[in-house]
């Protein structure tokens, strides 16, 4: 009996958490899937990959993940390219009543209340839980954007994605465009982005794709 023809896989996968629709933890609730798809379409990645790999399997796909908060339900740390919505927190010392609700809300222990509010930026993941709970608006969202992660993968030699930095959406889309261009320039069958980053060195790769 003739086997039914299998539907061809796309050259990329895009995984978006439900925060784009509804989630109490979402830092940004906007659905940016269309913007990412536009960058992918203009890059020529689909034509490039399908012209070189037959048949196309899941491990050949360029994997993108979008998470609306640091909880990472879309598994951004194992994607080739990922965006995690984040907030930069502003401080208004004069409004602080010293109630301590922010320190209890912070899962990263990034806040302390000795002689005013102190925020340890090296620990803060930008979840904005402190700003949401502060009754005096002493902590507030100063800016929202995305943490850009690059080169995550599982498989035989797994690699957690490394973080490039905090960027606006237009900046992040520009980074995706450059990442795809560099990957196509250096591509060979079986090469994943994480492998390329390790070969080039993270520092050189980040300089090449950064804004």
Q: At which residue positions do the language-model features occur?
A:
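Small-residue-enriched alpha-helical segments and adjacent helix-cap loops
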Residues: 1-105, 118-126
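Flexible, glycine/charged-enriched surface loops at secondary-structure junctions
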Residues: 45-56, 114, 185-199
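Active-site-proximal loop/turn and secondary-structure-junction residues that shape catalytic pockets
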Residues: 70, 110, 154
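Iron-sulfur cluster-binding cysteine motifs and their immediate structural context
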Residues: 77-80, 101-118, 129-146
């Amino acid at each position: 009996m003739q086997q039914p023809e299998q539907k061809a896989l796309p050259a990329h996968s895009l995984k978006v958490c439900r925060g784009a629709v509804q989630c109490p933890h979402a830092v940004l609730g906007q659905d940016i899937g269309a913007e990412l798809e536009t960058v992918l379409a203009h890059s020529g990645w689909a034509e490039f990959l399908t012209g070189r790999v037959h048949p196309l399997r899941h491990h050949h796909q360029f994997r993108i993940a979008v998470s609306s908060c640091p909880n990472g339900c879309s598994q951004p740390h194992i994607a080739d390219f990922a965006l995690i919505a984040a907030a930069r927190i502003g401080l208004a010392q004069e409004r602080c009543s010293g109630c301590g609700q922010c320190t209890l809300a912070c899962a990263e222990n990034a806040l302390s209340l000795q002689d005013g509010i102190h925020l340890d930026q090296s620990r803060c993941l930008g979840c904005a839980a402190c700003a949401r709970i502060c009754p005096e608006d002493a902590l507030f969202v100063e800016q929202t954007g995305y943490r850009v992660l690059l080169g995550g993968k599982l498989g035989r030699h797994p690699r957690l994605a490394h973080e490039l930095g905090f960027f606006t959406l237009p900046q992040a889309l520009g980074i995706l465009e450059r990442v795809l261009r560099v990957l196509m320039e250096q591509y060979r069958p079986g090469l994943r982005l994480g492998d390329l980053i390790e070969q080039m060195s993270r520092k050189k790769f980040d300089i090449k794709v950064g804004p």
